[in-house]
Amino acid sequence: MSGEDVRIDNMDLAILIKKELERKGIRKNGINGILGFQISKNEELEQIKDLNIINTNIGEIDELEKLPNLRNLKISSVNMRTMLKGEIMTPDDRYNYESKLSGIKDFSVIERLGKLEILQIDNEKNLKRIDTENLKNLVSLKLRDNPNLKEVRGLDFNEELSELDLEHNRGRWFEIK
């Protein structure tokens, strides 16, 4: 499997991966129209250790599993409280705000990213629960300003965890298991 190309169907994720590869100075194959983004697995995808999905409408994240060495994942949507302090929102402002929401509905793929060391998720209205049991290498977990987060599971299994920040999660009932 070392020389095989891996197809990333989520174009927004493909663009983020492309930017990360460019930042690292790694040559990439490019975007092939609407068919997806072809990347050599060993030479490129395996080199991505950090990924920031910040103020970017990405939708699905199930293809994060195609990044086998991902160590640091940050996901954050724009925070409405800090975007416009006391100003009236115009239609342009609303469009700008909505384009900065991640659009992620299902975060369960994160539970299968076993090499993660740092996980940060901020301002995600669709994050309701997360299970970190399989994230054995997790050192830092920051879950902040997620209004519907109600449950964090598996912390007992995160023996390397040295930083935990569960600030401003406004779920009515919040349970740590």
Residue ranges and their predicted role:
Residues N69, G114-K115, N134-V139, F157-E160:
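Short "repeat-start/strand-capping" segments in structured domains, especially the N-termini
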Residues L64-E65, G86, T132, G154-D156:
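Short amphipathic alpha-helical segments
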